Every structure is written in C-alpha cells, then in structure tokens.
Amino acid sequence: GCEKTIHELRSAYKDGKAIVSLDATNAYNTLSREAIFKVADRFPIMKPLITLMYANPSHLLHKDGVIMSEVGTRQGGNSSSTIFCVAAAPAIKSTSQISPNVDVHAIMDDISLTGDAQELSVAVPVMITELAKVGLRINLKKSVVLNCPELAARLGIPAVDGAKILGAWIGDDGKCEEFLDKQLNKCKPFFALTAKLAPEIALPVLSRCGVPRSNYLLRTHLPDHTKKFAINFDDMTLTALAAILRVPLEQIRREEVIRCIHLPLAMGGLGITAAAFIAPFAYDASVNADVEGAETQKSLTSQLNKTIIGSLPEELVAHLKLGENAGWIYSMQPNPHYGQGILLQVTGHSDVVCICSCGHRSTQRELALHALGCTKVHGPNVSSRHAAVKSTIINFCKRNGIAISDEPVVYHDGISTKRCDIRLVLPTEDVYVDVTIANAACKTHAGKPLSTIERNKTRE
C-alpha cells in the first residue's frame, strides 16, 4: 500500500523521472453524489448501503442550525473510503489509457504521476479534467513537481527539490534529516503527557501508542537517514519510561537496561522496542513487502533477541526467565489505605493471556498477583510466598543503590514495638519494611478493583 508507493516514488526520483504530486482540495467533502451512485450501478451489492446513506441530504449540525449536505462522503462512515476510491477510479483509468507510459500512484486522495516530462504534460491535465467530473478539484498551488522545473512551469505547478508524500520524504537526501526532525518534534507532546498518566495506564500507552510512532518512518526511509532520528526517538521513549517507573534516567540509559527493556514480554522484557535496533530490519522488510520479507524480518528480529540474551549477565538472564511471577515494579510509595504500608503494583498488558504452572489462566498483571499466592509456584506454606515478595523488594533496592539490612529488626513507632523484615539505610533516616501476604495476592481477588483490595487489606 502506502509503503510500496513510497518506495516506487523514491526509486523514480533517483532514476531522474519527473514526479507530479496533485493536491485535491477537501476531497472527501466534494465528491459528487452522482459519482457515488455510479458506484452502486457498477457494484450492485453496495446499492442498499449507498441508498441508505446517500439517497437523501445529510444533516450537518451547526451552532446556527442544520446544514443540508448534498455532496461528499459521510465523515467517519466505514464505507466512505471504499466509496471514494471506487468513485475516483474511472478518472485514474482514463488517464492511464490516454498516457499508458505514465505511472499513476494513487492512495485515496493522494495522487502522484511519474514518467517522461513530455508525456506528463499531457497526462496531468487529463487527470485534472477527469477528477473534476466526479467533483474533485486540484489545487495547483499546493501541488508540486519534482525533478523537472520546465514541466512545472508548463503546468503552472510549483517546482520543489523534495516533498512530503504519503507521510514520507521524497526528494533531496540532504533535507531528509530536517524532515525527520520535524516528525520527531511532533511526538514530544505525546511522550510528555504520557509520562504524567497513572503508571499502570502510562506503560501500555507508551508501548502500544508511543513506540509504534517510529515504525512507519523507519520502514519508509533508508537506515542511514533514520539513524539520528532513531537514537533521538529512543531517548525520548526512555525519558518517558524513566518518569513512569520513577527511576533516574541515567539508570534507564544503561546499555544493559535498554536491551532488557527492548526484549518482548514473552522473554521477560518490557516490549519497549528500540528504534535503533530494528531500523535496518524494518526498512528491508518494507522494501521486500511480501511473505518472504515478513519472514525475513521475523527471523532477524528473533536472532537479534537471542543475541541480546547472549550479551546479558547470567544472573540477569535467569531473572528474565522467571516469567511466572516476575513483574516490573514501577513504584514503592507509601499508601495511606494500608496504614502507610508500601503498596507494590506491577505493570501489565491486560489482554496478554498467561498460564501459571498450576493451570490458572489470567492476564499478566493479575497473574503476578496470583503467583504470589499460588502453592504450585512457591510451595504450600505462606513463608515461601513471603520470601518471594521480600526478595523482590531487596533486589529492587539494591538495583537502585539503597543500602539494606535483611536481618529481622525491631522497630518502635512510638506506640508499639513491631518486628520488621527489612531496614533501608537512608542518609536522613532508616525506613522499616514489613512484608505481609494477604488475600489481595490470591487469584480470587486478582481481578478486583484496587479500591476493593485496599478495603479488604485494611480490614484484615
């Protein structure tokens, strides 16, 4: 689709062919209803739907009343894109018949023509005329011509040395980096706002909506051109991740940590893909956009993940393999509902189904809670589950450079004497931690809202 068209246009540009990119003004809202009903005549199966949606004028609500719309496709309609493409297809077909040596690249309302300048001087006016027959008007001032100033002058269209077509840069390589920098800047507000969300929401949003923002650009631009972009994009991602996990950015930026973060969830990572790691694979797979290309990317990605695992310390690899009960702790903040106890929560992707060794099926976050109370994982006694949580806290503190003492300690809070499990030795004062295994860790409570779990814990 879009990616293939971009590669074809860039290849034509490199070969010195002239390129004309046409801009259709407000295309979806100007397509004639007559053209839409011709679609119904050509494809009878679509007639009931088109009759239902377009037989009568559409009501457009406005602050001053209702506007009756009698042109264009319905905004947001599931069939609107299909109807638009089928209605505009005759214009493209007519142009191709008159100028068979001209290549027409059309994705929705984004239409580009490539070929010999002389033939384009004939084909472009034909295309403009044919599109006008279905209600589409071409704005010559916003259209562009690449590789041929003479053709641009003849058509009355601006000549440029590069342009954004289908969301990618086509033209002078020297300006590609500038284009990618602009795309990077557009992502900054998203990452900044994502970091302010609640952590259990922020991490899935970051991995599913933030990280993929680089995919299209990586797949449609040469790795040499995206190298700087990928590095800066990864740094932006890591900055947001550090804010979400509430850890110093310097710790997140360590190469060892970046590799762990990059690994997929199934391998114990966070699934926060590093753009710099996958850029070459992504571009090659896009250029070879077929089954073979997809398999190649899958194979190379698998090989990369194995290489990353092989480069990590054995202790860390062993920890990553604890898929049943390992979770990434994002905070260790006192919770007033727990009598100022530390509330541990784990990040999770709610639709990722995991299976415990006891056979319990659950989502990742709930499984982490279930595993703490699962006798199959930790044994029948409470002490082994207690040890698992205690060990997690100790490892978390050690990784963050906090001095600890895991010898049983006695703490007096001014009211009573308490026996605690861990003492955190901080510059200002010591912090005492006591680990309690409660029903909140059991699978029967794992799916309940946090407020319910807090209420049950407080009562206990």
What are these model-derived regions, one by one?
Residues 338-366, 392-447:
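Active-site metal-binding core of divalent-cation-utilizing nuclease and nuclease-like domains
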Residues 118-125, 129, 137-162:
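Short, conserved micro-motifs composed of acidic
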Residues 444-460:
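E2/UBC-UEV (E2-variant) core
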